[in-house]
């Protein structure tokens, strides 16, 4: 466990008034008519609402605590996908989007939508960073490498964005373009890559530009937990041409399937071609993923001065590296679509009132309760304590350890709440999402039951402290683990997510969205939400 406690209060904030009771006539009071602290927001990642069935691990699991909370407390459902979280209609939500909307208290229009709009109105093809990247490759007679997730999942990348990159390269007369395709199988069906690769091949044929270089499962190319041994395999394929070999992209996938590998786990494979597709000195690389967390490590391997994650060999290539969005500010790389940070997010408001706040998660979801929850701000706010609990590293996938680090997360959360004067806490339980992605229903059931046990411990302490738990999820996953044909579904769902408030004298209004959680927390804390927050309190007085 690592902790980071940043003390401080807004100018003029009285010391030690975290638990002061405001004037009863204050319109900021919660529907219960009293301030309740601490408010603990529990995000049960990947726990959606769906009819019971053989593919719904949520309904299959024994969750007596969750069931009791639903029976005894105000509850309802929230929208967590599509326009309700700033995504296109029908697009499933994800952890980044979910936590951003939760913490911001408003619908935050996502990079997926923003980039797609730029393509539609033509601004994409005038983007200075992208045009300059193409100009460098064309002017030097070097290769433009387009790397990223080739997937229709819409969680980390978008097929239309890659096609637009290829079109831009053709317009800018880049003669050598290589697509390094990372395969999905988590946010798409486990063996769906061949269709996506064929779609991109058709685009390359129509434009007369581009060829495939390396085919790799995201397990290797898109790790986010510093498992550098995995990333090294992808890097070595890209730079040194090491790994499996195949005549073309389709053959690479066929061979992987014969080895028993689904898309996510395809070992890095070099597509044999007449021209060398390796990344070399003077080349230009564009990572086209719009979501940063799983693009960051491979980017660091190419662009971080003094990189020490693994041995990159005697001569790592000196390249111009460009990213679609900002993956890591400290790298100082050109970014095609810089971040647009919402202001006056929940963490900011709490800091401005001199209130202490606690953010807890295991490694897999740590960025979500910090960076994303705080509106894309990396540094902690005043009075913010962060606790990171390491995710298990002794298993290849979490179906082998479905409890993950949930019990450790709970231990740290309870110890901090019992020993500190926190007004607010947010905690993420990663299990339903991370184990749901494995497609192993029995493991997902065990994961949910572990979270339910932790839920009971947290609610018990918070109730004893006089506080309120807000129980919800950022998106669905474990609620939809089978396709209609009986094959595994490892992607997120577009189902509604639960919302439970352990508050008395209130009921949950209908039509809620994730962006309504921050205003709800502020109301329970007796604070007025800022005008930038356009969400609304989910609780209203009982009749």
Q: Across the structure, where does each feature detected by a protein language model lie?
A:
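Feature captures the catalytic ectodomains and active-site-proximal regions of enzymes
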Residues: 2-543
């Amino acid at each position: 466990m690592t902790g980071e406690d940043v003390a401080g209060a807004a100018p003029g904030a009285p010391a030690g008034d975290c638990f002061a009771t405001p004037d009863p006539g204050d319109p900021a009071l919660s529907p219960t008519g009293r301030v309740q602290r601490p408010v603990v927001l529990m995000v049960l990642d990947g726990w959606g609402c769906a009819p019971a069935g053989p593919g719904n691990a949520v309904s299959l699991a024994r969750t007596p605590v969750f069931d009791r909370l639903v029976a005894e407390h105000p509850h309802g459902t929230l929208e967590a996908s599509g326009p309700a979280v700033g995504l296109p209609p029908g697009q499933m939500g994800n952890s980044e989007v979910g936590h951003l909307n939760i913490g911001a208290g408003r619908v935050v229009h996502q990079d997926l939508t923003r980039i797609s709009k730029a393509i539609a109105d033509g601004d994409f093809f005038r983007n200075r960073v992208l045009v300059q990247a193409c100009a460098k490759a064309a002017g030097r007679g070097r290769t433009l490498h387009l790397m990223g997730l080739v997937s229709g999942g819409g969680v980390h990348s978008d097929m239309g964005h890659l096609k637009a990159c290829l079109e831009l390269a053709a317009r800018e007369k880049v003669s050598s373009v290589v697509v390094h395709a990372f395969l999905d199988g988590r946010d798409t069906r486990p063996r769906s890559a061949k269709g996506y690769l064929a779609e991109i091949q058709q685009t390359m044929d129509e434009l007369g530009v581009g060829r495939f270089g390396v085919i790799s499962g995201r397990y290797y190319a898109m790790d986010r937990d510093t498992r550098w041994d995995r990333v090294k395999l992808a890097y070595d394929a890209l730079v040194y041409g090491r790994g499996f070999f195949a005549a073309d992209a389709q053959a690479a996938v066929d061979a992987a399937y014969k080895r028993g590998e689904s898309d996510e786990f395809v070992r890095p494979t070099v597509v044999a071609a007449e021209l060398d597709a390796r990344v070399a000195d003077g080349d230009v690389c564009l990572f086209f993923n719009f979501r940063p967390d799983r693009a960051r490590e491979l980017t660091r391997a190419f662009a971080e001065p003094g990189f020490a994650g693994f041995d990159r060999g005697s001569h790592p290539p000196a390249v111009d590296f460009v990213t679609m969005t900002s993956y890591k500010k400290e790298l100082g790389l050109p970014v095609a679509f810089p971040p647009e940070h919402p202001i006056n997010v929940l963490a900011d408001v709490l800091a401005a009132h001199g209130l202490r706040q606690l953010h807890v998660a295991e490694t897999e979801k740590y960025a979500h309760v910090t960076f994303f929850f705080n509106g894309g701000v990396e540094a902690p706010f005043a009075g913010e304590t962060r606790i990171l609990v390491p995710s298990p590293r002794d298993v290849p996938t979490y179906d082998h350890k479905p409890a993950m680090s949930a019990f450790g997360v709970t231990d740290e959360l309870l110890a901090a709440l019992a020993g500190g004067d926190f007004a607010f806490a947010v905690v993420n339980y990663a299990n339903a999402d991370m184990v749901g992605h494995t497609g192993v229903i029995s493991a997902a059931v065990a994961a949910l039951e572990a979270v339910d046990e932790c839920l009971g411990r947290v609610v018990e302490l918070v109730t004893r402290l006089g506080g309120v738990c807000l129980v919800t999820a950022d998106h669905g996953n474990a609620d939809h683990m089978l396709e209609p044909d009986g094959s595994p579904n490892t992607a997120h769902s577009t189902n509604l997510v639960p919302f439970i408030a352990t508050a008395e004298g209130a009921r949950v209004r209908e039509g809620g969205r994730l962006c309504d959680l921050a205003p709800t927390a502020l109301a329970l804390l007796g604070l007025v939400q800022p005008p930038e927050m356009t969400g609304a309190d989910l609780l209203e007085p009982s009749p």
